Swiss-Prot record:
PROSITE patterns per the UniProt record, alphabetical: RIBOSOMAL_S13_1, RIBOSOMAL_S13_2
Descriptive protein name: Small ribosomal subunit protein uS13
GO molecular function (one): structural constituent of ribosome
Family matches, as SUPFAM superfamilies: S13-like H2TH domain
Subunit structure: Part of the 30S ribosomal subunit. Forms a loose heterodimer with protein S19. Forms two bridges to the 50S subunit in the 70S ribosome.
Keywords: Ribonucleoprotein, Ribosomal protein, RNA-binding, rRNA-binding, tRNA-binding
Length: 121
């Protein structure tokens, strides 16, 4: 199994798709990596030789991927929360951050409904 950026990429898939299993690499970036390294995107991972894998590793080293990228994103959110800006407070309260309405239609972010009983008369 080919190991790139600390991730075992699936052997049976095309290289173009297999690279997307690495956090931080989508289809567009995978295509750019393959073009830059000169590896054919249509071959399967199991058919790659060691030279191709080395080329892919060398090109992916240029990007922030996996743990470093997760840490970077976490630090950005923590910074927003620490400075107390609106976005940081919304993240802390698990509410929509980008101005969406919350009276209705915020179920994904707010979680399941918590039913409140009506007042007895």
């Amino acid at each position: 199994m080919a190991r790139i950026s600390g991730i075992d990429i699936p052997r049976e898939k095309r290289v173009e798709v297999a690279l997307t299993y690495i956090y931080g690499i989508g289809l567009t970036r995978a295509q750019a990596i393959l073009e830059k390294s000169g590896v054919n995107p249509d071959i399967r991972v199991k058919d790659l030789d060691d030279g191709d894998i080395q080329k892919l590793r060398a090109v992916t080293e240029e990007f922030t991927l996996e743990g470093d990228l997760r840490r970077q994103e976490g630090m950005a959110l923590k910074r927003l929360q620490d400075i107390g800006c609106v976005r940081g407070r919304r993240h802390r309260m698990s509410l929509p951050v980008r101005g969406q309405r919350t009276r209705t239609n915020a179920r994904t972010r707010r979680g399941a409904r918590k039913t409140v009983a009506g007042r007895k008369k």
